[in-house]
Each structure stands twice: as structure tokens, then as C-alpha cells.
Regions:
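Type III/flagellar secretion export determinants
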Residues: 1-159
């Protein structure tokens, strides 16, 4: 219902996916997203504490230590050598959520759950926005009641 309201409001203002919708979408995706900031924080804290001085030490760390560092249900894997080395962090479903490389730093990977929320919200918004724009272009008012869209004509019988 909130998405339909925002789409209708944006359609009236001739804005597609305005700030309010984007903020709502971000908040909804955050509900299913892994806490990447905490994962990055744990890694950075470990690197700066002197426990792990460089990627070579990470390479030598066993999988158990990497899992302890990032916490259950996350798993980590070190891959490669030299400048092409990377650490990959996986969620409980085996989906990669973060990658760290020395030259680039952190790179976030979207999970299937996050993609699903994005898709559902964008699809619902698109349909509601399209219906509202169509009604506006046809010179009708759109009234939202529950999840149904009721179209009322602006035709004036007295004119």
C-alpha cells in the first residue's frame, strides 16, 4: 500500500522512483541483507590490531580461524597469490556477500534475498506508477482503496 501511495505521488510530480521510494526500498532490503559493515569492521579491526599484518598471513590462516573472525554463519576463503589474492566471505546459504582484494578493497555482492526484495518492490512500484500516469494522462483521478485501484472520471455533467 505504501508503494502504491508513493508511486501515485511521484506520478503526480512527474518523478520516477523519488527519494521516499528509494529510502523505503533501501530500508526493506536492509532487513534481508547481511551486516556487511560488521563483517568489514571485524576484518579491519583484526588487520589494525597486529593480529594479521598482511594478506600473506591471511593466506596461511586456516578456514576455521577465518570463520571465527567473521562469525557463524559466515565462512571465508582465501584465494590466489600476490596482488591477485582475495578473501571471499559467504553467508549461510553459500552466497558470496563480500570480497576483499589488496588493490581494490571491499566489494559487496548482492544476495538472492536482496535481489528478490529489489525486484518485488520495483515491480510493484512500476505497475502502480504506470497506472497512475495513465490515469493522469487520461484526465482521471485515481483513488487508492486497500490494494484496489478505483478510477473516477473528471467528467462534469453540468458543463
Amino acid at each position: 500500500e505504501k508503494i502504491v501511495e508513493l508511486a501515485k505521488k511521484d506520478a503526480k510530480n512527474n518523478i520516477y522512483m523519488g527519494n521516499e521510494f528509494m529510502n523505503l526500498r533501501k530500508a526493506e532490503v536492509a532487513k534481508v541483507a547481511p551486516n556487511r559493515a560488521a563483517l568489514i569492521g571485524k576484518f579491519n579491526q583484526s588487520m589494525s590490531s597486529g593480529n594479521m599484518g598482511d594478506m600473506k598471513e591471511i593466506q596461511e590462516a586456516d578456514k576455521r580461524w577465518l570463520c571465527i573472525l567473521f562469525g557463524i554463519p559466515y565462512e571465508a576463503e582465501y584465494q590466489g597469490e600476490g596482488t591477485g589474492s582475495a578473501i571471499h566471505i559467504y553467508n549461510e546459504g553459500g552466497e558470496e556477500v563480500l570480497t576483499y582484494t589488496q588493490g581494490v578493497g571491499w566489494h559487496e555482492k548482492e544476495t538472492k534475498a536482496e535481489t528478490g526484495v529489489h525486484s518485488a518492490l520495483k515491480s510493484a512500484y512500476y505497475e502502480a506508477y504506470h497506472d497512475a500516469r495513465k490515469a493522469l494522462n487520461n484526465g482521471t483521478n485515481v483513488e487508492i482503496t486497500n490494494e484496489n485501484v478505483v478510477v473516477q472520471s473528471n467528467f462534469d455533467m453540468k458543463a
